[in-house]
Amino acid sequence: MAKEIKFAEEARRSLEAGVNKLADTVKVTLGPKGRNVIIDKKFGSPLITNDGVTIAREIELEDAYENMGAQLVKEVATKTNDVAGDGTTTATLLAQAIIREGLKNVAAGANPMILKKGIQKAVDVAVEELKNTSQKVEGKEAIAQIGAVSAADEEIGQLIADAMEKVGNDGVITVEESKSMGTTLDVVEGMQFDRGYLSAYMVTDTEKMEAVFNDPYILLTDKKINTVQEILPVLEQIVQQGRKLLIIAEDIEGEALATLVLNKLRGTFECVAVKAPGFGDRRKAMLDDIAVLTGATVISDELGYDLKTATIDMLGTARTVKVDKDNTTIVEGAGDSSAIKDRVNQIKRQIEETTSDFDKEKLQERLAKLSGGVAVIQVGAATETELKERKLRIEDALNATRAGVEEGMVAGGGASLVHVIPAVEALLETTEGDERTGVKIIRRALEEPLRQIAANAGLEGSVIVEKVMSSEKGIGFDALTEKYVNMIEAGIVDPTKVTRSALQNAASVSAMLLTTEGAIVDIKSDEPSMPGGMGGGMPMM
């Protein structure tokens, strides 16, 4: 296919036009007085949101050159979202500022490759300074502040802090849509997995249709159980003790299942059977997790164990087991606490080593089930449009809170970036030429988030930036009350990881765009598409 090529200034200006179209759409959402953007959807109601990456993902421009520029900045937002889960609007805004200032200097004759070196040096210094000023997130109040600032809603911040308090920092917190109008928090204690009972006849509570056992034995195996003879020896030992039994196996079918149900109906012996969670290697790992949690031994050919020779010592126990048609929950397993701790540390190491996002997510779920539990935030709203917007805000706030717990927090509202400017300015003494110009580009870009927050509040950004720069560290501008305050004391904080990632990703992509000297796109074909074939029916007479 034939290509069209643009060079030098013409190419860079076309790319910049695309960058500006995307960034101008996203940046109106920044700050406590930022607005929303409405996005048309082919199916369902339009989406109203202030989430930077959601807006960026929807933007495709007609002009191919402009679209390339937009896609590059979209990558800044997406990468920041992947790493930190929030800060996508800040990242987009920083990228726009670096590209704007950089292209001015390239047009004036600066060498882009040397500019890039200066930009990188300045970013490294700024990031180091951010880490030095970062404060540890300790206590429920600090966690609530990060969530509240990200979602612009104190209630959401409090909800996330409650969830983290109940399931721990490693716990899984999921966000789901509620059928009611209110937003609530449900906490599942212990280990839960998505496998329910194999027969409804096994329930102990017919009203709730669930089986609840206190202090039962737990039999774990990766085999199929087809006949009751396979497990008869161990069943006889359990019946003698008058205890109940939870069986977790690859499957239980035919005569084995029928016999267990029959004994339950006759009142001889109470048992509930479920399939093992997961598939393949993940199933083996999850069975091992349950074994460690409950103090059981997985009866498996690989380990040299057979069901027929299984003994009571191989079974695990737990304070309570609850099984409904979809889920099994094990609360307070009787496993050895040091073995559980070792297993948790092993999973943490696997999380650090894996490169797959899917594997990381599954490992984090396993970690949560072993170490804390699962909290579910049920999001409610009056309309579907409000529900979608609220759910996105809560997801962002949750990501921001996790990032804060991980790397600490800095003053929010763009103040932390303004306060690292003196450290960046110190570089001007040790650099020269175009490298020095690169440092100046970052120095100017660091003001941009605060300028935009002020502009979105209908105020003059330059005056506010000047005032914050001349104030001591930690002082910033609260756009909601329009006062200068100590940002951390006022609870206006950003996670260090979010601010750092936004700056690093913006500088990385922007510096690459500045070094562009040619741009190539496909030439659009003006040929009309092929006409449709003749319709069916009788030919004309």
Swiss-Prot record:
Pfam family, one: Cpn60_TCP1
Catalyzed reactions: ATP + H2O + a folded polypeptide = ADP + phosphate + an unfolded polypeptide
Any single GO BP term: protein refolding
SUPFAM superfamilies, alphabetized: GroEL apical domain-like, GroEL equatorial domain-like, GroEL-intermediate domain like
Compartment list: Cytoplasm
One of the record's GO molecular function terms: unfolded protein binding
GO cellular component assignments: cytoplasm
Residues noted as binding ATP in the record, renumbered to the chain: T29, L30, G31, P32, D86, G87, T88, T89, T90, G413, D478, A479, L480, D494
Keyword DNA-binding: no
Top-tier EC class: isomerase
Family named by the database record: Belongs to the chaperonin (HSP60) family.
Task performed by this protein: Together with its co-chaperonin GroES, plays an essential role in assisting protein folding. The GroEL-GroES system forms a nano-cage that allows encapsulation of the non-native substrate proteins and provides a physical environment optimized to promote and accelerate protein folding.
Full protein name: Chaperonin GroEL
